[in-house]
A protein has these predicted regions:
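PLP-dependent class I/II
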Residues: 1-200
Length: 200
């Protein structure tokens, strides 16, 4: 299963080839691949349009599950998405969106470095909407993301503790920060509030 809602949200260099594109050169591999994508992350959060590329048997079963779940995706939303995609402006939209998210990601990384220093570790994101952070516990700082989350809320900022994202052996020192909706100034303010939560 290749779940790829953020694949088009790269900042500088395009990501490595998807399994879907690689499957074209490996005979029979498409029969074993299920590729999922979405417009809600790259175009409009309220436009709940996604797709599944898979073998016919899996598609038939997925269609049945979808129909039992909610009958079908809004016809209006589908028509709106189709018209937009036919218009040919998606490449320009993606370029603008990538530039916005790249600036937000940079602002978050810069703020984390200046405000929290060695209390956190992270890899600068090359795309997407999130930053994965590990609390180091340096100089006696917090290492428990759940405990920090409670204090962060008291400071007026929130994040998602990382443990639920693990399929096994969750790491309680991890957290996921989002730069999707806040502008650069609000991101800096949020990280400053997170610093206060460390000291609370």
């Amino acid at each position: 299963v290749e779940d790829d809602p953020y694949g088009d949200l790269y900042f500088d260099q395009a990501p490595p080839a998807s399994l879907l594109s690689l499957s074209a050169s490996v005979p029979g591999s498409r029969d074993w691949l299920a590729h999922c994508g979405s417009l809600s992350k790259v175009l409009c959060p309220g436009l709940r349009i996604g797709w599944l590329i898979a073998n016919p048997e899996l598609l038939a079963r997925a269609t049945m599950c979808k129909q039992f779940s909610d009958a079908h995706t809004s016809t209006y939303a589908q028509a709106t998405a189709a018209q937009y995609l036919r218009s040919g402006v998606m490449p320009q939209t993606l370029a603008r969106v990538r530039a916005v998210y790249a600036k937000r990601a940079q602002a978050m990384c810069d703020a984390l470095r200046s405000e929290l220093g060695d209390a956190v570790e992270f890899v600068q994101p090359q795309g997407g909407l999130f930053l994965w952070v590990r609390l180091t516990g340096a100089t006696g700082q917090e290492r428990d993301a759940n405990a920090l989350a409670k204090r962060a809320i008291e400071q007026g900022v929130a994040f998602v503790p990382g443990a639920p994202f693990f399929s096994q052996n969750p790491d309680p020192s991890t957290l996921r920060l989002s730069f999707a909706t806040a502008d650069e100034e609000r991101i800096r303010e949020g990280i400053a509030r997170l610093k206060k939560a460390f000291k609370a």
